[in-house]
Regions:
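ABC ATPase nucleotide-binding domain "signature" loop
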Residues: 29, 33
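Polar, enzyme-active/binding microenvironments
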Residues: 23
Length: 120
């Protein structure tokens, strides 16, 4: 397929620096693996790199919780990532959200909540 209009950056969200922004920034099942002490830096980058939309697709928990990940601790963290981002940047509006179900016969994935935010 021709993906000329899509630009993918294969880099660490903790290290990438650029002076560009995009119509949409998307992060999926990455925030759950970021040390909570580094989240503010990641939120800043997601916001900075977006002209208009931010889409977050992650495991959700109303309060922060650490989950054992394949026998390891300090590797998976669930929380309300979208809520935290909206509190940090009050000009973000929640315009849509949904749930991806692991037993979906057409598009199976993990049980993930997604949130589409828009800058005012």
């Amino acid at each position: 397929k021709n993906l000329e209009q899509i630009e993918v950056f294969h880099d660490s969200i903790l290290e990438i620096e650029m002076d560009r922004s995009f119509d949409l920034t998307l992060i999926k099942t990455v925030l759950i693996h970021i040390n909570p002490e580094e989240l503010d830096k990641v939120y800043s980058r997601l916001y900075k790199f977006s002209n208009k939309y931010i889409c977050i697709a992650e495991y959700y928990s109303p309060s922060p919780v650490e989950v054992n990940y394949r026998g390891h601790s300090d590797k998976l963290f669930k929380r309300d990532f979208a809520g935290e981002l909206m509190r940090k940047y009050p000009d973000l509006d929640l315009i849509d959200y949904g749930f991806i179900y692991h037993n979906d016969p057409v598009f199976p994935q993990d049980d993930i909540n997604w949130f589409l935010l828009m800058k005012k």
